[in-house]
Amino acid sequence: MKDLVDTTEMYLRTIYELEEEGVTPLRARIAERLEQSGPTVSQTVARMERDGLVVVASDRSLQMTPTGRTLATAVMRKHRLAERLLTDIIGLDINKVHDEACRWEHVMSDEVERRLVKVLKDVSRSPFGNPIPGLDELGVGNSDAAVPGTRVIDAATSMPRKVRIVQINEIFQVETDQFTQLLDADIRVGSEVEIVDRDGHITLSHNGKDVELIDDLAHTIRIEEL
């Protein structure tokens, strides 16, 4: 039963992530993200639809019901609170934080959540600049405001300029090679980097190191002008 619950939560969180990125949540996108077969995803989505968690719209996009969104919000809140705990208190290496938080999100109790918001200094955003949603349910106030700034893919031009990193989406954190390149260049949320689009290839430069972003990930980092 626990595996079934974890799978449901994982699917809902993936839909939530896609929405955050401005990507239409389709079964094909879930199959790509979770590395599952098309038939497996279709069966799981059908079960979630029967359970009243999602609706398959006429354009085949997946829309969360109010019940589904409440559950997705809770899972993402636990995930990002865990990321803050792992980073701010435990001091886990930043490249391990996301994967560890993925395990914690399924087992963290409501009581632990309420303690965390009292212990942690900053519960507005994750260490990667992502808003921690649904804090009003913990009596902290709502943090669902949109992240400031612009997606790299929408901001880069052929003229190099300095910008500040304000958000690194969840999907970027699981792309190990690209994320490692970013960390090796000491690029974090808050870093001031040079951004340029060279013939359709977007590059971030920091401390003398260049990171050429994979095309499929250029929408997953947000920046703001200096």
From Swiss-Prot:
Changing I214L: In strain: C7(-), C7hm723(-), CD95/305-, CD95/211- and CD95/407-. It is found in: Cytoplasm. Changing G141R: In strain: CD95/211-. Keywords: Cytoplasm, DNA-binding, Iron, Repressor, Transcription, Transcription regulation. Changing I214Y: In strain: 1030(-). Changing V174A: In strain: 1030(-). GO terms for molecular function: DNA binding; DNA-binding transcription factor activity; identical protein binding; protein dimerization activity; SH3 domain binding; transition metal ion binding. Changing I221T: In strain: CD95/407-. InterPro entries: DtxR/IdeR_SH3 (IPR040767), DtxR_MntR_Metal-Reg (IPR050536), Fe-transptr_FeoA-like (IPR007167), Fe_dep_repressor (IPR001367), Fe_dep_repressor_sf (IPR036421), FeoA_core_dom (IPR038157), HTH_DTXR (IPR022687), Iron_dep_repressor (IPR022689). GO terms for cellular component: cytoplasm. Changing S205R: In strain: 1030(-). Coiled coil: none annotated. GO terms for biological process: negative regulation of DNA-templated transcription. Residues 4-65 form the HTH dtxR-type domain. Changing D199V: In strain: CD95/407-. Iron-binding repressor of the dipheteria toxin gene expression. May serve as a global regulator of gene expression. Represses ripA under iron excess. Homodimer. Belongs to the DtxR/MntR family. The N-terminal region may be involved in iron binding and may associate with the tox operator. Binding of dtxR to tox operator requires a divalent metal ion such as cobalt, ferric, manganese, and nickel ions whereas zinc ions show weak activation. This is Diphtheria toxin repressor. It comes from Corynebacterium diphtheriae (strain ATCC 700971 / NCTC 13129 / Biotype gravis).
